[in-house]
Design a protein with these regions (language model features):
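Acidic/His metal-coordination segments adjacent to aromatic residues that form catalytic metal sites
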Residues: 2-12, 68-92
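Divalent metal-coordination and catalytic microenvironments
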Residues: 20
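Conserved alpha-helical segments that form or flank metal/cofactor-binding pockets of metalloenzymes
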Residues: 40-72
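Single conserved hydrophobic/aromatic residue that forms the stacking wall/gate
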Residues: 102-111
Length: 111
């Protein structure tokens, strides 16, 4: 078996994981809107579909355990590793990502 790390397959799994994860969150958002508008049956369909997307995303992530967290590159799999990866991801968000986005957005806000 060839190494998954730095392969086209790893790249594809990361892209598929991101797509399935985003679909899950969109469908949950759509379900919430359907609930607010009184479409309870539609909301239930969105939630069921979101759960399916979760299963797909988890399947991709299971393969990616071999190469690490797709967001941080940290090892994942055990609870200890998962906690470290989650902390690394959240730390990146508040120390780098959002600060960078603020600096990029500032000129737009001023125009």
């Amino acid at each position: 078996m060839t190494d998954l790390k730095n392969s086209k397959t790893e790249e594809n799994l990361k892209a598929a994981f991101a797509g399935e994860s985003q679909a899950n969150r969109r469908y949950l958002y759509f379900a919430q809107k359907a609930d607010i508008e009184g479409y309870n049956d539609v909301a239930a369909v969105f939630r069921s579909t979101a759960e399916g997307e979760t299963g797909h995303a988890h399947g991709h992530l299971e393969f990616l355990e071999e190469t690490g967290d797709p967001a941080t590159g940290e090892p994942i799999g055990s609870t200890g590793d998962n906690l470290k990866a989650a902390i690394a991801g959240e730390t990146h968000e508040y120390t780098d990502m959002y600060l960078s986005l603020i600096h990029i957005s500032e000129p737009t806000r001023r125009s």
